[in-house]
Amino acid sequence: MSGLIIVRRSRIHGNGVFAARDLPEGTELIEYTGRLITIAEADALYDEIHTGHTFLFTLNEEWIIDGNVGGNDARWINHGCAPNCIPYLHAHPRDRSKDRVIIETLRDVEAGEELQYDYGISFEVPYTPRLKKIWACRCGTPRCTGTMLKSGTHERLAG
C-alpha cells in the first residue's frame, strides 16, 4: 500500500492526505493504526466531545484505536460530506481486539486529490448549536452538512 498517499497541508483543516497517483475505485490505501484502548479508557483519557479534535477511531462496541499514540498517516485523513474513501472494518472471527480498519477508495481518485471519508461522529447527547460548532465541517462541497456529527435522532431532539 506504500506510495499511494502523501501528507501535506489541507485547505479543509491542518494536515490532509492526498492521492500520490491516480487510484482506481476499491484501492486499499492504508490501515488506521494506533494504541488499542477500551472505550472506558478513552472516556477517562479524553474529553473529545468538547474539543472538536480527536484521532480516536471506534473499532467496535469495546475497543478504540487511539491514533494519538502510535498512529500513522491515516489519522490525517479529513472528514468530507461527499467522501471519496471509506473505512472498512476487517473483523477478527474470535478476538474483537484484533479487528482492523482499512481505508479504501469509494470511487476513482485523481492524483493530488484530497482523500476524505465521512467520520459519522455520534454522541449520546443532544446535538446543540455549540456542539455542532465544535464539530463543524469545512469540506466545502456542495453537499456539505456543516457538521461532522452523524445525523439522527439526537440532532432532531436538539431542535
Task: Indicate where each model-derived feature is located.
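Conserved AWS/pre-SET-to-SET junction and N-terminal core of the SET lysine methyltransferase domain
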Residues: M1-H50, N84-R100, E155-R156
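Short cysteine/histidine-rich zinc-coordinating motifs and their immediately flanking basic loops
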Residues: L149-L157
